[in-house]
């Protein structure tokens, strides 16, 4: 094939084709069919332009080369065949002088008579398939497309063929001659089959063998092969499609497509009512830790041993009393439960050998707090199906709650840095491939940004608590086991540290199904006075249990220490997901990675290092009433992580529904910003679906508030 090309085409065309292949890193010794295709395309472009001039009156005329008037202005500017830089320079120059719209892709010619760019196509397949591929790639009505085939067929935009019939006939004759010459040398079949279709930036993978057969078998009806289906999809024009489908539907379906304009969307309505309350399974920003550094005590690593050691570091215990009662609970029972924990821990310390686990005495206060014997008796359905007034429990609608500022404060705090390191880098062996090296580099940079983050502390705390609770639920089903709430970290200097946040007492846990509930009482230390935001602590009974000496700028100050006590519950499936909270790190790393990939594809090199080390650059973090908030790349990493962690901590059906429904509105708004002229029907129904998820969940309400800020700024 290479010999044929060199014999068949003008040496100048061959040289230009060689340069083009070199520029794109292709080997003409291997890609011989591509070499022939490039030469053919170049020759057609030159023949298209040949002999066509514009005279002084601005009329298009045809002049043979030996004519003395050949100094007239050329009708066509040839862009194909130039190196990319020069080609774009020519295109920019044409756009500046003629006011033509700049094309996204390099065209082949510019027609000074019709004032338009022209894309020339030469295909070995059917012209309409290739035309659709070209049109789909270019996506511009301003660029004129003209396709020729080796069989003498042609196709052009709006059937406007630009040239006179004789000029086009010369091109078709030349293509037919090339085909005949190839066929006589036995090259045509290989050349015809090698055409891969119009490639966009995403190169088409070759599908062969079994996969190809499966692809052909998996098509919708009326399509014989994958190529035909691909051409149909590429050339599919969505405008009017939905309207057409709607007109075929039942007459009861009454959907008119309304244009979605900047003035169309309204803010999401947030519910009114009392402020929402804290519903996480453990305290977040309000938690207090009793800690030991460099633990080396006997039984170190056994939770109960660690907990007792941490309790011994505090000397300010005092007679506990209730400072913020639980509105609906029997508050003396919560107080008695804490006193029982203290007493039973003291009993353990008095024993010669501390046990590995501690089962609490089943006192009346714990039975009440853990709902022992409170569940209604289950009766077999067959025994009661004949009862005439058998009905399901009446359940009250949940009370609507309004957004409260504490949840935004919780989120801000989760994004902050602590003075401890919460995750270690695993040893995963040497990198082998370059992609592994890039992956390791990204992971290391990301870990450095989030290892001190408070959201990472919440991950490790959640993993520990859920693991311990699930283990105890399976190992001690009938016992009221005392479970210390522990986490481990390192100080900035690298010293190990064990922290105690408080205790959990679990109730009976015969968990057969994933959704069966185990009740537990949580008792957590804090320095936060609950009387400052009583609505946040609606579900808690809060005791004052001691005084803590804290170092401050004015010396040591004494602050009251509180214990936040509440009854709570969880299930096997929730504990399973809680144990896997480390996935949040992976999710946020992937989001950062997609930002790096976008940057890298623009710059055409891996931008990981620059991305993390360019400290001067700021990135969008999120929306607030003030506008788009920006911050360092580290802040972006920590914010994305905190969002992922809060999605786990505050997981609920309300969040699932809001995320799914608001995403639809988000996509419509983004389409509007991208000037895609979106249309909608039943927008009111979409708002209804979004707003029915806004009931009382603090995290969902905060997300809805953020969404409203986004709407305000996106549609300015």
Curated annotation (Swiss-Prot):
Gene3D superfamilies (UniProt xref): Influenza RNA-dependent RNA polymerase subunit PA, endonuclease domain
Protein name: Polymerase acidic protein
Role summary: Plays an essential role in viral RNA transcription and replication by forming the heterotrimeric polymerase complex together with PB1 and PB2 subunits. The complex transcribes viral mRNAs by using a unique mechanism called cap-snatching. It consists in the hijacking and cleavage of host capped pre-mRNAs. These short capped RNAs are then used as primers for viral mRNAs. The PB2 subunit is responsible for the binding of the 5' cap of cellular pre-mRNAs which are subsequently cleaved after 10-13 nucleotides by the PA subunit that carries the endonuclease activity.
Family: Belongs to the influenza viruses PA family.
Sorted UniProt keywords: Cap snatching, Endonuclease, Eukaryotic host gene expression shutoff by virus, Eukaryotic host transcription shutoff by virus, Host cytoplasm, Host gene expression shutoff by virus, Host nucleus, Host-virus interaction, Hydrolase, Inhibition of host RNA polymerase II by virus, Manganese, Metal-binding, Nuclease, Phosphoprotein
CC cofactor note: Binds 2 manganese ions per subunit.
Keyword Nuclease attached: yes
Gene of this entry: PA
Subunit structure: Influenza RNA polymerase is composed of three subunits: PB1, PB2 and PA. Interacts (via C-terminus) with PB1 (via N-terminus).
EC id: 3.1.-.-
Localization (cell): Host cytoplasm; Host nucleus
Binding site for Mn(2+) 1: 41, 108, 119-120
Motif Nuclear localization signal 2 (NLS2) in this chain: 184-247
């Amino acid at each position: 094939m290479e010999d044929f090309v060199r014999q068949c085409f003008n040496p100048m065309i061959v040289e230009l084709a060689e340069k083009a292949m070199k520029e794109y890193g292709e080997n003409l010794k291997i890609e011989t069919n591509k070499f022939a295709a490039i030469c053919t395309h170049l020759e057609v472009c030159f023949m298209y332009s040949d002999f066509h001039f514009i005279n002084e009156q601005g009329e298009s005329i045809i002049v043979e080369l030996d004519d003395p008037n050949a100094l007239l202005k050329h009708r066509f500017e040839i862009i194909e065949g130039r190196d990319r830089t020069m080609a774009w320079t020519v295109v920019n120059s044409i756009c500046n002088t003629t006011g033509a719209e700049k094309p996204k892709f390099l065209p082949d010619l510019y027609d000074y008579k019709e004032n338009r760019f022209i894309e020339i196509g030469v295909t070995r397949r059917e012209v309409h398939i290739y035309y659709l591929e070209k049109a789909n790639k270019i996506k511009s009505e301003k660029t004129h497309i003209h396709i020729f085939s080796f069989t003498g067929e042609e196709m052009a935009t709006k059937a406007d063929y630009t040239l006179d019939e004789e000029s086009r006939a010369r091109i078709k004759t030349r293509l037919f001659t090339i085909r005949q010459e190839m066929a006589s040398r036995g090259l045509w079949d290989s050349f015809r089959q090698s055409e891969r279709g119009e490639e966009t930036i995403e190169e088409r993978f070759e599908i062969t063998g079994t996969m190809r057969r499966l692809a052909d078998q998996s098509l919708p009806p009326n399509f014989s092969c994958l190529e035909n289906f691909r051409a149909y999809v590429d050339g599919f024009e969505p405008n009017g499609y939905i309207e057409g489908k709607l007109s075929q539907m039942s007459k009861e379906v009454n959907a008119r497509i309304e244009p979605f304009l900047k003035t169309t969307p309204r803010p999401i309505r947030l519910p009114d009512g009392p402020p929402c309350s804290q519903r996480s399974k453990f305290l977040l920003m309000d938690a207090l830790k009793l800690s030991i550094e460099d633990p080396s005590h006997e039984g170190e690593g056994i939770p109960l041993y660690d907990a007792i050691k941490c309790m011994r570091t505090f000397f300010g215990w005092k007679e506990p009393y209730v400072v913020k009662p639980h509105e609906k609970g029997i508050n003396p029972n919560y107080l008695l439960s804490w006193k029982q924990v203290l007493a039973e821990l003291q009993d353990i310390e008095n024993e010669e050998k501390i046990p590995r686990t501690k089962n609490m005495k089943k006192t009346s206060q714990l039975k009440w707090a853990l709902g022992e014997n409170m569940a209604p008796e289950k009766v077999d359905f067959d025994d009661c199906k004949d009862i005439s007034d058998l009905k399901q429990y009446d359940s009250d609608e949940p009370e609507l709650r309004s957004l409260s500022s504490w949840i935004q404060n919780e989120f801000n705090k989760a994004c902050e840095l602590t003075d401890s390191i919460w995750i270690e880098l695993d040893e995963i062996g040497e990198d082998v491939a370059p992609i592994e090296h890039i992956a390791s580099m990204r992971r290391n940079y990301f870990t450095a940004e989030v290892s001190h983050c408070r959201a990472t502390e919440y991950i490790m705390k959640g993993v520990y608590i859920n693991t311990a609770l699930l283990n105890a639920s399976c190992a001690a089903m009938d016992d009221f086991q005392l479970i210390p709430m522990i986490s481990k970290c390192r100080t900035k200097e690298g010293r190990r540290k064990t922290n105690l946040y408080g205790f959990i007492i679990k109730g009976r846990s015969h968990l057969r199904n994933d959704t069966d509930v185990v009740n537990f009482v949580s008792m957590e230390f804090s320095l936060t006075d609950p009387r400052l935001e009583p609505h946040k602590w609606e579900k808690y009974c809060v005791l004052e249990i001691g005084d803590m000496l804290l170092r401050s700028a004015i010396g040591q100050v004494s602050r009251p220490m509180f214990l936040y006590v509440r009854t709570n519950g969880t299930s096997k499936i929730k504990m399973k997901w809680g144990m896997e909270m480390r996935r949040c790190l992976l999710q946020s790393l992937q989001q950062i990675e997609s930002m790096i990939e976008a940057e890298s594809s623009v710059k055409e090199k891996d931008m990981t290092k620059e991305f993390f080390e360019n400290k001067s650059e700021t990135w969008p973090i999120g929306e607030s009433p003030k506008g788009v908030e920006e911050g360092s790349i580290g802040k972006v990493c920590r914010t994305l992580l905190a969002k992922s962690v809060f999605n786990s901590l505050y997981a609920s059906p309300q969040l699932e529904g809001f995320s799914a429904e608001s995403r639809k509105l988000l996509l419509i708004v983004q389409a509007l910003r991208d000037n895609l002229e979106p249309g909608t029907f039943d927008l009111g129904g979409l708002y209804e679906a979004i707003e029915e998820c806004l009931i009382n969940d603090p995290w969902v309400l905060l997300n809805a508030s953020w969404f409203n800020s986004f709407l305000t700024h996106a549609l300015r």
